[in-house]
UniProtKB/Swiss-Prot annotation:
Binding-site list for ATP: 119, 296, 319, 333-337
Full protein name: Cyclic GMP-AMP synthase
Region (Disordered): 29-64
Effect of residue 131 to A: Loss of activity
Family: Belongs to the mab-21 family.
Cofactor note: Binds 1 Mg(2+) ion per subunit.
Keyword Transferase: yes
Enzyme class: transferase
Binding site for Mg(2+): 131, 133, 242
Subcellular location field: Cytoplasm, Cytosol
Residue ranges the record marks as coiled coil: none
Enzyme Commission number(s) from the entry: 2.7.7.86
Primary location: cytoplasm
Length: 422
């Protein structure tokens, strides 16, 4: 009898008693296991399986459509706190107002005003509010210059040969056989000197604040270090402000809203090593780059307002990934913004509802990868200006392969999204 009871215990342990004794067997003193108990056993198996799936999901936390992972990454690694944004704006406004007044007083014929552009003012800045971009609008008028379009995106700005112009801007121009051209380098040096004098007048008057000025190519960079603060996170904070001279022209013969009505040029020349389709028939150091910063800001201002979409959040996530990845970091913020403009403002209607963030994210990465593979990412406003001409073929191939790996491989994506902000 003991042997029989041992056998029954073994059958129950391996859940075989229902198979052998599917009917009651009173002669052996065996009662058939009740159905509710059997259901509890089956439910227990499902729970074990569910836990196993969850463990697998934790190992691969970004399957397609995983909105939660993107949202979490956006909060922990991408978004800038309101306090940080408020601090940067307050600090910038304080210093820029002093500089603006000095420039207005000491260079009334040349300095006009500041234009607040770039990712901070487009609400596309990520990680930290530590860099700002300002266009310095000069007072030179369009009817004083002849714009000579030399290559897509770049132009020479020649002073018109008129009696009123003959003694103007002598310190800012370079003469050649064709006339006098406004020099980006000379204009940048002039503005640096003007701002340096402004900074010297007040840098020792603001307590707990160190102000330095650096010559960063075409930009005059104001570096503000705040040594003390009411809050721990404010101590030793740095804010870098790039100030770039610009000419903002309006062709009044064109109707309002016409893309050709506004012509903006900044004191930035062609990058060294840029691949050009044809040799320049012009001295490259005299070229000014055409700018669309104000138009881009206008487009970005409208984002997500009508449909409460996730466009800005998606762009910020991509920018953060690109910035942190050694291979992708060869792409500039402007590359990402240009690709987004093409992607968002195409003829294809996209669903930007918040719950579609993960779908839009992967789809945009595919769009960017395809542009890079084709080695063609044209300026949104100048379709024959390829922004990838600044990169060599080897780097472009590496970027394309890296994007492809992130898109196709969930493990690679997991590595990106588990990296926390330092």
């Amino acid at each position: 009898m003991a042997t029989l009871e041992r056998l029954l215990d073994l059958l129950r342990e391996y859940h075989l008693d229902d198979v052998l004794f599917h009917n009651s067997t009173p002669e052996l003193g065996i009662q058939h296991r009740s159905r509710p108990k059997q259901k509890r056993i089956i439910r227990g198996k499902k729970q074990q399986k569910s836990k196993k799936l969850k463990r697998n999901e934790q190992q691969q936390p970004f399957p397609k459509g995983d909105l939660e992972t993107l949202r979490r990454f956006s909060v922990t690694d991408v978004k800038i706190s309101k306090q940080s944004t408020k601090w940067a704006k307050k600090m910038a406004d304080k210093h820029l107002e002093i500089i603006r007044k000095h420039c207005k007083t000491n260079s009334i014929k040349l300095f006009n005003h500041f234009e607040y552009t770039g990712s901070f003012y487009e609400h596309l800045k990520t990680i930290d509010a530590d860099e700002l971009d300002i266009m310095v609008a000069l007072s030179i008028k369009m009817d004083e210059l002849e714009v000579e379009q030399v290559t897509p995106g770049y132009a020479g700005l020649k002073l018109r040969d008129t009696p009123s112009n003959r003694n103007k801007y002598n310190d800012l121009t370079i003469a050649d056989n064709y006339g006098r051209y406004l020099s980006p380098e000379k204009v940048s040096r002039w503005f640096f000197s003007l701002v340096q004098k402004a900074v010297n007048t007040y840098k020792d008057e603001i307590p707990q604040t160190e102000v330095k000025l650096t010559d960063n190519g075409p930009a005059t960079t104001l570096v503000i270090t705040y040594r003390e603060g009411d809050k721990p996170q404010e101590k030793n904070r740095r804010l870098s402000i790039d100030l770039v001279p610009a000419l903002l022209f309006k062709d009044k013969t064109k109707p309002a809203g016409d893309d050709l009505r506004a012509w903006h040029y900044v004191a930035k020349t062609i990058p060294k090593g840029a691949r050009l389709k044809e040799p320049l028939p012009f001295r490259s150091e005299l070229l000014w780059r055409q700018s669309f910063s104000l138009k881009e800001k206008h487009l970005m201002d409208k984002l997500d307002k009508d449909d409460n979409g996730c466009r800005r959040e998606m762009v910020r996530i991509v920018k953060t990934i690109v910035k942190k990845d050694p291979t992708l970091a060869q792409l500039s913020s402007y590359h990402i913004k240009t690709a987004f403009l093409q992607y968002n403002f195409s003829d294809v209607k996209l669903d930007w509802e918040g719950k579609k963030l993960a779908e839009r994210f992967l789809h945009f990465l595919e769009f960017l990868r395809d542009r890079v593979k084709d080695k063609t990412l044209n300026n949104y406003f100048i379709t024959d200006l390829n922004l990838l001409d600044d990169l060599n073929d080897s780097n472009i191939d590496n970027i394309a392969n890296r994007l492809d790996k992130i898109i196709q491989n969930e493990t690679e994506r997991a590595k990106i999204f588990t990296t926390q902000r330092q």
